[in-house]
Amino acid sequence: MSDPKLLAISGSLRAGSFNTMLLKTAVAAFGPADVTYGDIRFPLYDGDLETAEGIPAAVQTLHDQMQAADAIIIATPEYNGNLSGVLKNALDWVSRAKPMPMNDTPLAIMSATGGRTGGVMTQNSLRQCLTPFQPHVLQGPAVAVAMASTVFDEHGALTDERYQKAVQKLMDKLRSRV
């Protein structure tokens, strides 16, 4: 049996992103897999652009990766209580490509933030944004890494044992759904 296809998406474009670090931790915890990191560097969604030029190639690529994935992980920062604009924009674009991707695909959400809540509000916001796609969003255990600058080392490794355990439990659950 071949390794499952795992799509990993960071909702942050920032170099040194804590969410990208968290995502890499999760991918390692998931275990053997054919891993793809989704790229969400798209132009802002614009219906006129879509009408004039169609679905951008980068959007179609992410759509196809979502369609092919056996499981998906999304790590998102929290900006003003919501998911990042780039992640929301990516979901808006991908929803325009057909067929609708992620239907029935097991999906894990996680977040890392500089604040004390770890991104709980952004996870709720992301769940709402995913509703039209109808993935099987795992309901826990929650991975909401608070005070992220204090729990990753200079190499991007997650050093807090309680968060490491939460990531492992979530990835074990995700893998069991594949």
Question: Model segments located where?
Answer:
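Short helix/strand-capping connector loops at secondary-structure junctions
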Residues: 144-157
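Exposed boundary/loop context
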Residues: 4, 9, 108-111, 149
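Short, intrinsically disordered, mixed-charge
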Residues: 92-99, 128-132
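Acidic pyrophosphate-coordinating catalytic loop
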Residues: 50, 115-118, 150-153
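Amphipathic alpha-helical interaction elements
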Residues: 11-14, 99, 115, 135
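Short, glycine-/small-residue-rich phosphate/pyrophosphate-handling segment
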Residues: 103-147, 162
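N-terminal beta1-alpha1-beta2 submodule of the flavodoxin-like/Rossmannoid cofactor-binding fold
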Residues: 1-97, 154-176
